[in-house]
A protein has these predicted regions:
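N-terminal secretory targeting modules
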Residues: 1-83, 259-261
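Extracytoplasmic/secreted cell-surface and envelope-processing proteins
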Residues: 95, 154-159, 194-199, 226-227
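Sec-exported extracytoplasmic/periplasmic mature domains
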Residues: 108-112, 143, 151, 173-180, ...
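Active-site segments of SGNH/GDSL-like serine hydrolases
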Residues: 149-150, 173-204
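Charged helix-capping and loop-helix junction motifs
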Residues: 161-171, 199-206
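Catalytic His-Asp segment of secreted/periplasmic serine-dependent ester chemistry enzymes
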Residues: 195-261
Length: 261
């Protein structure tokens, strides 16, 4: 009889333990499901926000060449910086009031921390740039996009336009040989008052860009006409470079290109 009672009590204990475990699992299962559902919603919300940010950043790049915006999108997905180089003559200026700095600062504020910038300026003609192998500076940057002001004003009276254009081709070809997906944009230097032969040079530069399929950012559209003395208000006294107001004018044009409204 005692043996039967012991077996009975043991069975009761086992049943109680099993019932308690089932009850505990039932209590914890609901919070766990709720927690997982909450985490899923948070993750989904985060994904939606990231996608909206991605689309917004791409919309700012709407003016860019297709190959540039595509590469930019890929860099965004990989969370890698997109490298932009502004290169050319001393018309690039230096310091916070120069057009490269103004453009870069505005792009950083608009897009966020998604770019690496480099500014390369030279007091050289295009021929000197090529002969001194300064193109290696561009190659070392491994840029995704290069905005080149190709020394056209420095070449004025020193290098014939045919040679200038050949030099531009050599520069671009050398960079593309090293990194074939680099995208080039061309732009003129600053305008000058009462220009004559300089206008002929730039007509040829623009034609070269169009025939080569290279976007030509003609910021002269933002300046007074070259026959208007008012243009001197935007240039240094010797007309060799834009002054502070000229840099602002130049920068505003480029900002409108790099940051689509």
């Amino acid at each position: 009889m005692k043996r039967l009672l012991s077996i009975f009590l043991a069975a009761i204990c086992v049943i109680v333990l099993i019932a308690g475990q089932i009850h505990w699992k039932g209590k914890t299962a609901i919070p766990n499901k709720q927690e997982k559902a909450k985490e899923g919603k948070i993750s989904e919300t985060r994904d939606i926000a990231e996608e909206q940010r991605f689309e917004a950043l791409l919309s700012f790049a709407a003016n860019w060449p297709e190959e540039a915006s595509t590469a930019f999108a890929q860099k965004l997905r990989k969370e890698e910086p997109y490298k932009i180089v502004f290169a050319g003559s001393e018309a690039l200026g230096e310091g916070a009031d120069s057009w490269p700095e103004i453009v870069a600062e505005k792009m950083a504020r608009t897009y966020g921390d998604v770019f690496d910038f480099a500014f390369l300026s030279y007091d050289l003609t295009s021929t000197e740039f090529v002969e001194q192998n300064k193109v290696q500076d561009l190659i070392k940057e491994e840029a995704d996009l290069i905005l080149l002001e190709p020394f056209t004003l420095n070449d004025n009276g020193r290098v014939v336009i045919e040679t200038s254009l050949e030099n531009i081709e050599r520069i671009i070809d050398a960079v593309l040989d090293a990194k074939q997906d680099t995208v080039f944009l061309l732009q003129p230097p600053q305008p000058i008052y009462n220009a004559s032969w300089y206008l002929f040079q730039l007509e040829n530069l623009q034609r070269f860009a169009e025939q080569s399929g290279i976007p030509y950012l003609n910021h002269w559209e933002a300046w007074p006409d070259t026959k208007d003395p008012a243009i001197n208000q935007y240039l240094t006294n010797d007309r060799s470079a834009p002054n502070e107001e000229g840099h602002k004018l130049w920068a505003e044009f480029l900002i409108d290109y790099f940051i689509a409204n």
